[in-house]
Amino acid sequence: MRPGSNVIKAFNVIGMLCALVFGAPAMAIGIDDLSSKDAASGLKEALTKGAEVAVGQLGKPNGFLGDARVKIPLPESAQSVEKMMRTFGMKKQADELIETMNRAAEMAVVEAKPILTNAVKSMSFDDARGILAGGDDAATQYFKRTTSEAIGAKFLPIVKKSTAKVDLAGKYNKYAGKAAQFGLMDKKDADLDSYVTQKAMDGLFLMIAEQEKAIRKDPIGTGSNLLKKVFGAIGK
């Protein structure tokens, strides 16, 4: 196989899907056994797998804590306090709080899977067309738009249950709330549970975006049977 041929084929797959979804005649692209419905279904398969991979990566032990891209630190406005804690012999407590935050995110993120899957199932033909024709993060933006509220509602109680086990988390909320009243801390960072919930969502969508980029770069790598069907057809 010539160098770069897989990359060329990958772009051809995306081009073919766009042609199918936009209604180009099948014979015009050399395939007469695929329909626009097949193309949209193939996209849904790929996005479902991508979402599952993202959730799986983050939901495993150290999915957040062990990955610098998504690890949740203390809020920026509280990091000076963290530095003081570490300086004055409270390193263990600071580490415990940060670990608790990230473990909470790891437990919560698995709840996103059915919500993301349902968003894919509910995707309209126009949504699919927009994703195929959109930018590198068009699918990620679709997920954000359609799932953020539901995911946040699922994450928050799980995060609260986890942080409630750590005394320092309660103290953080107490003193950070007062600091926010006096303008010494950003209000969005004053509630640790809400902060962790948002950061967990940010991490999830970051990983989904990376999966989307991988799908666009190498559709065949998703394992979608319909995309394999297209790939095989253009590879003959």
Residue positions per predicted region:
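An amphipathic alpha-helical core segment
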Residues: I158-L204
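Bacterial N-terminal signal peptides that target proteins for export
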Residues: R2-G15
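A cross-kingdom marker for long, charged
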Residues: G203-K236
